[in-house]
Amino acid sequence: MNITAIIPARFASTRFPGKALADIAGKPMVQHVYERTARARLVSEVVVATDDDRIAQAVRGFGGRVEMTSRDHETGTDRLAEVASRIGAEIIVNVQGDEPLIEPAMIDEAIAPLAENPAVRMGTLKSRIRTLHDFLSPNVVKVVTDLEGYALYFSRSPLPFFRDKWNDLKDESFASGRLLCYKHVGLYVYRRDFLMEFAKMPPTALELAEKLEQLRALENGCRIRVVETAHESIGVDTPNDLEKVLEKLK
């Protein structure tokens, strides 16, 4: 089975321009993501998708494969679909280009349900929420799943609402495991044919309200398999996030 991981990488970024090329221990960030992704056991090939010549040159410089894409894409999924349309992979993995500490095992965990069950068309990850701050933060996307591990909903709001415990919530409630709730980890796996369908679907009401593209799949009746991971990663959205990554690598 051909499983290709695609890393969308843009130079433009509102909060951290050029972050894909930010230096981390002598390598650009995109190289760290590429090399860690290539170590995933189930991944056959890794490709960087970009519309920027500087990023393309950097990727070629470390021997990576790069595919140039249109500058007109509104979402990362559109960029992903453009590259997927050119390659013969059966399964496409979308690895965020700003996750330089991503664990290869996380990628394998997300792929496994699609590799094992042809009925699964889309998959992603979740991890335990361990602080009250994360539970309440709109920047931490929450997910709830059914008993078979399929997503019921994703939201920036606290989810679920613990009606009887709301006034007593504190960090210890989450750290101890007494309250089990989960944050979404933004790594996606698609069957190629579904990705091509998904990219053509118009934005949906809940997607636009929450600014969460995966809700488009749910609103169109696609079941999303969500696997719990014990691994953690750090997304680099700001220079401050980069400092956290550098601290971890010391």
Curated annotation (Swiss-Prot):
Function per UniProt: Activates KDO (a required 8-carbon sugar) for incorporation into bacterial lipopolysaccharide in Gram-negative bacteria.
Keywords (A to Z) from UniProt: Cytoplasm, Lipopolysaccharide biosynthesis, Nucleotidyltransferase, Transferase
Cross-referenced InterPro entries: Cytidylyl_trans, KdsB, Nucleotide-diphossugar_trans
Pfam family, one: CTP_transf_3
GO biological process: CMP-keto-3-deoxy-D-manno-octulosonic acid biosynthetic process; lipopolysaccharide biosynthetic process
Gene3D superfamilies: Spore Coat Polysaccharide Biosynthesis Protein SpsA, Chain A (3.90.550.10)
Gene expressing this chain: kdsB
Name recorded for this polypeptide: 3-deoxy-manno-octulosonate cytidylyltransferase
Family listed: Belongs to the KdsB family.
GO molecular function terms attached to this record: 3-deoxy-manno-octulosonate cytidylyltransferase activity
